[in-house]
Amino acid sequence: MVYQTKRDVPVTLMIVFLILLIQADAIVPFVLGNMRVSGWIIFILLTLLNGLIIWSFIDLKYVLKEHHLIIKAGLIKHQIPYENIDKVVQKKKLWSGFRLIGSRHAITIYYQGGWGHAVISPQKSEEFIHKLKEKNSNIIIFTKSK
């Protein structure tokens, strides 16, 4: 089952700001009149970087397979076996961990191996957590208090 990322305005604005900042850096050599090969190389590399950022943000999804969770964003693909997942914490946590998110309202998946935890923001997060629990009944779920 595929879950697209939930998106909110602050994270989207942060990504747009990052893209604009990188692209501004890419055109600096042209503004300063340094039309050398190095300026073109910098422009092309930074434009490609922006393309990867945009692709990753647009293509961000979480896939529940038979034996593992796949977190996919552009070229990035991370697999977490269900048996390695210890707990899932639902809270507003944007600034730590391996995070491929489109929203500040995220869930943190703690697991053995790799980064140790991943912060994700699936649409229908309650359903997503329920499906994870179906895949591994030993997962401990901590939900946000209202």
Curated annotation (Swiss-Prot):
- Kindly list the biological process annotations in GO that this record carries: bacteriocin immunity
Pfam families registered for this protein in UniProt: bPH_4 (PF06713)
Report what the protein is called: Uncharacterized protein YyaB
Source species of the chain: Bacillus subtilis (strain 168)
Q: Which gene encodes it?
A: yyaB
